[in-house]
Amino acid sequence: KEGYPVGRDGCKISCVINNNFCKVECQAKWRQSDGYCYFWGLSCYCTNLPDDAQVWDSSTNKCGG
């Protein structure tokens, strides 16, 4: 599984071009995962996630309220 990790505010975790920052963010939630900064979305993106990992979903988006 893969997807955008969600911050405490329910939003995607923002980044600019810092892949290491995103890798740390992903591994803090899911130890075996990897991550990078998705340039077009300016958000961290995690890969190699467990099936039950909760990631950002446009249909359940709670960002900003």
UniProtKB/Swiss-Prot annotation:
Record keyword Cell membrane present: no
Q: What is its main location?
A: secreted
| S-S bonds | C11-C63, C15-C37, C22-C44, C26-C46
LCN-type CS-alpha/beta domain mapped to chain residues: 1-64
User: Which InterPro entries does the annotation name?
Assistant: LCN-type_CS_alpha_beta_dom, Scorpion_toxin-like, Scorpion_toxin-like_sf, Scorpion_toxinL, Scorpion_toxinL/defensin
SMART domains with a match to the protein in the record: Knot1 (SM00505)
**Alphabetical UniProt keywords:** Disulfide bond, Ion channel impairing toxin, Neurotoxin, Secreted, Toxin, Voltage-gated sodium channel impairing toxin
Q: Which GO terms describe its cellular component?
A: extracellular region
Protein role? Beta toxins bind voltage-independently at site-4 of sodium channels (Nav) and shift the voltage of activation toward more negative potentials thereby affecting sodium channel activation and promoting spontaneous and repetitive firing.
The name on file for this protein is Putative beta-neurotoxin RjAa7
Organism classification: Eukaryota, Metazoa, Ecdysozoa, Arthropoda, Chelicerata
